[in-house]
Amino acid sequence: MLENEDLAPLIDQQALAEFRNRALTPEHPVARGMAENPDTFFAHRESCNNYYANVPAVVEEYMEKISEITGRKYGLFDYYGAPDAERVIIAMGSVTEAIREVIDHLTAQGEKVGLVAVHLYRPFSAKHFLAAVPKTAKRIAVLDRTKEPGANGEPLYLDVKDCYYGQPDAPVIVGGRYGLGSNDTTPAQILAVYENLAMAEPKNQFTVGIVDDVTFTSLPQQEEIAMGGEGMFQAKFYGLGADGTVGANKNSVKIIGDNTDKHCQAYFSYDSKKSGGFTCSHLRFGDSEIRSTYLVNTPNFVACHVQAYLKMYDVTRGLQKNGTFLLNTIWEGDELAANLPNNVKRYFAENNIKVYYINATKIAQEIGLGNRTNTILQSAFFRITEVIPVDLAIEQMKKFIVKSYGKKGEDIVNKNYAAVDRGGEYKE
């Protein structure tokens, strides 16, 4: 992380002071642009052209300075992928990290694919953009995270089309939309974009992440693939709003992040009901940088903290072969076998899933924690997965208990200590 002292030499303090002195303030009132005739307004509006024209060079200069400090290359447009890529995606924002994951997967198989990540969108520098795109590119897909009904395309798509206007041997360019309303964008969807570019006539103005059965803009969904490489552990926790599952998982991430060299990531999804509603926690731990900017869809471990979810949601979806499943349930033995849905039992058998179950609800009531099963199930998670040494996990959990509940009295702390200790009462 850069400190202020690292960045201070890059800033022209005098220019910054002059800028602040021009700020509107009631202590030094000034009127600007109150009234202007048409002949001068138009001319004044165009007078800013040179300032905008100079912005790319200025930004590039400072990006080079930042690159020197961080050791990471930053440009107005950054290319990633095969040097002789024929199919290229143009995008900006967090989705570019997911695209990089897919590129690594495809180039390892000999595919000629790439990405141009946009860092300076306005003003859009055609010169820098064209320099970033490989000369070998034959097909380009431009991804926009917006929709402009009635237009011939979305903004970034039209900018890219304009860059190639009138050029001989220009690549085929199509546009698509993704991620509206924070809709998840997964590797399978990125794969669909590259597959679309490989078609004889790629679909233009396509969508990914939805099934559009009205106007048929959506691309066929590809099968999800596990990303992250060796050493990546992914987990999903299905819980009930206010049962403490989300809070416990936030603590788990802190425990692992603070006590190991592992990279950690946590996403949390909720429905609109909050308390009493559906929650799902998505955790990742890895030995290398985590570039997955989407919810976990191929977990190694799944915990279902509400047994009713077995018949309400597809809780085993994406669980990897030889993965682990933990169920909080009141059922045992033959009753458990009788109540598990057939599709769940079939998935367990076909994918060699290790299944554990625990009656955390009963344990919580015996301890005096009511319906707060979170600490019990968090303890079970650490014991089953051994993602970090169990003794270390238990020690750190108890430290977090003191930090979280210490002000509520020794009785509450001791009850949560008991919950940690009884987290080992699961059965296989």
Over which residues does each language-model region extend?
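Flexible inter-domain linker/hinge segments
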Residues: 50, 181-234, 413-428
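A glycine- and small-aliphatic-rich helix-loop capping segment at beta-alpha/alpha-beta transitions
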Residues: 2-5, 159-163, 251-260
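Active-site-proximal beta-alpha loop/turn segments in soluble metabolic enzymes
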Residues: 40, 44-47, 176, 402-405
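Short secondary-structure transition/capping segments
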Residues: 29-39, 160-172, 217-225, 310-321, ...
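Active-site cofactor/cluster-binding pocket
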Residues: 123-124, 139, 143-154, 229-241, ...
